[in-house]
From Swiss-Prot:
Its cofactor is Mg(2+); Mn(2+). It comes from Saccharomyces cerevisiae (strain ATCC 204508 / S288c) (Baker's yeast). Residues 241-556 are annotated as: COX1 intron 4 encoded. This is Intron-encoded DNA endonuclease aI4. Residues 1-240 are annotated as: COX1 exons 1 to 4 encoded.
Length: 556
């Protein structure tokens, strides 16, 4: 039985195998479609808990499954192999063994596609795999490479099938069946095969160039290396236009031949118009670049004259960047790690709570890198391995890193990259390092002591010198906690110290995580505490206000 189906080169057997693969892929694609529709059925996050990367992976998987593993295998591979030899009076296709290979590369492509969703955080690039979202900076793992391999394998299958159908139609017609007597279904398969033969090498070239950009440091689509991301769009949609025509031809193959010819003319018109539009855009851009150069030369003398608003804006941007760099250094000191792989590759990892994803997104927007969920824990990890991004980040935080362990790691990274190491600057009260370290290792909680609620803001660390600055500049107390192998804990509990910390420091240096929400609720906590609203015996409205506060605190 295995040999009967797996080794068969009979066109009808292979058609049945195509249908089986298409049905399986269609069911998987339908399941993904259902999840996508359920997620979009109402505003806000429904089932994926705000995991936008997972949603993007589902979109990619759904599109590739439906187009490359359902529509094309079923309409061309299935119906074509079963009906085309019958309609032209042939016993089989021209190349039966090529037919067998054309099918069996598809399951391998399906394995690559499924594997791509299970590696790293998945290929969340959109089904067109456009750079720069598909570049190594945005998706550093092998997930996108596996998705591209899946596209390569489907392209090989379609190319082999197209060659087979073209040769079969031209050379294996029965006596007396001339081309103008062919059924329209055979014509649609024949034209489709030609379109695939012309367009698939272009798609394969585009995704191969993308693979080279990702893995061999070329810059076909990398702007910083002189590449052009729009080139990929042109290459992909040279194939994409063909896919639309293929689907129309296959779905409406029973229409009159004149209508088929109109569709073909429309496709040719679309291709030509696309090419001419691209040429026109490039000519227009070239003309504009010349005009810009002339304008820049004219304005050179005026460049040094800055209006007061421009000067103010530049100073404000510099101040904001300085605050961000100080905050980032504090976050790295608390939850970060500088690593060196094989004595030559540097990397940075930062792990935060799942609800603080937006803080990592802000870092990613500035320096690149990737973000993925940590398995088994409610945490999310940011990872930066790109050398350009690492150099930019190290220059940003140089002089602000001060954690005992992190300083040693940071110094080694600076030596490897040839960057001068700057010793930590002296901390002042307006330095955002404190809030960055608080976002990483700090907590704000309240507990009941002798039936009275007590609010505590604290920061913990293994080394005394890393929390000593909090006491020196912001006040409070430090004590040694023997639990969890021992650590030092800085804390403030009195109302005056907590409110001073929020009003004098946090207002000027706001937290970039969800801790900021609880800090804002502190004033409400003290107002309700003065009213003794936490007592069940107190006024019912006050107790309801306390319950409402507790609910907001838990949700923050």
């Amino acid at each position: 039985m295995v040999q009967r189906w797996l080794y068969s080169t009979n066109a009808k057997d292979i058609a049945v195998l195509y249908f089986m693969l298409a049905i399986f892929s269609g069911m998987a694609g339908t399941a993904m479609s259902l999840i996508i529709r359920l997620e979009l059925a109402a505003p806000g996050s429904q089932y994926l808990h705000g995991n936008s990367q997972l949603f993007n992976v589902l979109v990619v998987g759904h599109a590739v499954l439906m187009i490359f593993f359902l529509v094309m295998p079923a309409l061309i591979g299935g119906f074509g192999n079963y009906l085309l030899p019958l309609m032209i009076g042939a016993t089989d296709t021209a190349f039966p063994r090529i037919n067998n290979i054309a099918f069996w590369v598809l399951p391998m492509g399906l394995v690559c596609l499924v594997t791509s969703t299970l590696v790293e955080s998945g290929a969340g690039t959109g089904w067109t795999v456009y750079p720069p979202l598909s570049s190594i900076q945005a998706h550093s793992g092998p997930s996108v490479d596996l998705a591209i391999f899946a596209l390569h394998l489907t392209s090989i299958s379609s190319l082999l099938g197209a060659i087979n159908f073209i040769v079969t139609t031209l050379n294996m017609r029965t006596n007396g069946m001339t081309m103008h007597k062919l059924p329209l279904f055979v014509w649609s398969i024949f034209i489709t095969a030609f379109l695939l033969l012309l367009s698939l090498p272009v798609l394969s070239a585009g995704i191969t160039m993308l693979l080279l950009d990702r893995n061999f440091n070329t810059s076909f689509f990398e702007v910083s290396g002189g590449g052009d991301p729009i080139l990929y769009e042109h290459l992909f949609w040279f194939f994409g236009q063909t896919v639309a025509t293929i689907i129309m031809l296959m779905m409406y193959n029973d229409m009159h031949f004149s209508k088929c010819w109109k569709l073909l003319k429309k496709w040719i018109t679309n291709i030509m118009s696309t090419l001419f539009k691209a040429l026109f855009v490039k000519m227009f851009m070239s003309y504009n670049n010349q005009q810009d150069k002339m304008m820049n030369n004219t304005m050179l003398k005026k460049d040094n004259i800055k209006r007061s608003s421009e000067t103010t804006r530049k100073m404000l941007n510099n101040s904001m960047n300085k605050k961000f760099n100080q905050w980032l250094a504090g976050l790295i000191d608390g939850d970060g790690y500088f690593g060196i792989v094989s004595k030559k590759y540097v990397s940075l990892e930062i792990t935060v709570a799942l609800e603080d994803e937006m803080a990592l997104k802000e870092i990613q927007n500035k320096f690149g890198g990737s973000i993925k969920l940590r398995s088994g824990v409610k945490a999310i990890r940011y990872r930066l391995t790109n050398k350009t991004g690492m150099i930019k980040l190290i220059n940003a935080v140089n002089g602000n890193i001060r954690n005992t362990k992190r300083l040693v790691q940071f110094n080694k990274v600076c030596i490897l990259l040839g960057i001068d190491f700057i010793y930590p600057i002296k901390l002042t009260k307006d330095n955002s390092w404190f809030v960055g370290f608080f976002d990483a290792d700090g907590t704000i909680n309240y507990s009941f002591k002798n039936n009275h609620p007590q609010l505590t803001i604290s920061v913990t660390n293994k080394y005394l010198q890393d929390v000593q600055e909090y006491k020196n500049i912001l006040g409070g107390n430090i004590y040694f906690d023997k639990s969890q192998n021992g650590y030092y804990k800085w804390s403030i509990q009195s109302k005056d110290m907590v409110l001073n910390f929020i009003n004098d420091y946090i207002k000027m240096n706001p937290s970039r995580t969800t801790k900021m929400n609880k800090l804002y609720l502190s004033k409400e906590f003290y107002n309700l505490k003065e009213l003794k609203a936490y007592n069940k015996s107190s006024d019912s409205m006050q107790y309801k206000a306390w319950l409402n506060f507790e609910n907001k605190w838990k949700n923050k």
